[in-house]
Curated annotation (Swiss-Prot):
UniProt source species: Bradyrhizobium diazoefficiens (strain JCM 10833 / BCRC 13528 / IAM 13628 / NBRC 14792 / USDA 110)
Keywords: GTP-binding, Hydrolase, Metal-binding, Nickel, Nucleotide-binding, Zinc
Binding site for Ni(2+) 1: C2, C5, C7
Residues binding Zn(2+): C168, H169, C200
Gene: hypB
Annotated segments matching region Disordered: 18-61
GO molecular function, one term: GTP binding
Binding site for Ni(2+) 2: C168, H169, C200
Function: Involved in the maturation of [NiFe] hydrogenases. Required for nickel insertion into the metal center of the hydrogenase. Exhibits a low intrinsic GTPase activity, which is essential for nickel insertion.
Stated name of the protein: Hydrogenase maturation factor HypB
InterPro entries: CobW/HypB/UreG_nucleotide-bd, Hyd_mat_HypB, P-loop_NTPase
Lineage: Bacteria, Pseudomonadati, Pseudomonadota, Alphaproteobacteria, Hyphomicrobiales
Keyword GTP-binding (UniProt): yes
Gene Ontology biological process terms, A to Z: protein maturation
Amino acid sequence: MCTVCGCSDGKASIEHAHDHHHDHGHDHDHGHDGHHHHHHGHDQDHHHHHDHAHGDAGLLDCGANPAGQKIAGMSSDRIIQVERDILGKNDRLAADNRARFRADEVLAFNLVSSPGAGKTSLLVRAVSELKDSFAIGVIEGDQQTSNDAERIRATGVPAIQVNTGKGCHLDAAMVGEAYDRLPWLNGGLLFIENVGNLVCPAAFDLGEACKIVVFSTTEGEDKPLKYPDMFAASSLMLINKIDLASVLDFDLARTIEYARRVNPKIEVLTLSARTGEGFAAFYAWIRKRMAATTPAAMTAAE
């Protein structure tokens, strides 16, 4: 996981707003403590031939230890400590973001998926159809280019592009700075489109109300079992490209069953960013969440 491997080096590039700016009066600390790239070289040539007569001879499980991962030269205890330090700092910044969103009565969603699942196409349709009902802003995360933010802006909705460079996910500091560059979204919606990656974004709280995992019918039914942390961390699974399900012989019931093995409480909606099928149900879900996050509703829930 990138909490210890150092893929995020604090050198994200965040666009300046396009004719929009609002001053939140907050200072942000954007560095990641202890993020370094490690290159583990071996001076010896190893020529080992192992004959295993074990039932699991075909499986090398590097996650079968207290740290949940294996890194050359680091003990499980050290991995756990480094991860705690990095995530602890991020969690403090995420709490700051969450407080700001609450003060602005902004409902923030963190959209996560593997590359090519259709997050951006989904967002383009959604913001186009919701922009007359809500103030909307979008934060786009990619390693390079502003292509996705430009697609959002073409709808008339403001978007800030965050290029993470070598980083494989957004973090709370990046989101806080990008939010500063959006127009004021008082009482509106903030969509955060994370970098396409079903691993690292699961660990990083951005201050969002919830994570929405976008999954497409082209990915196969077992993705929730292969990447359980992301599905466990998400409140809603949007199954995109449902218009292709019959062509692909996609088993919807099996996919939902796999997702609920990992997260029994996950909600599931099917839709097609291409045809618009299922978007009415998605908008109803958003409006229900909006109603639940009004100041009166939040006070009653405490």
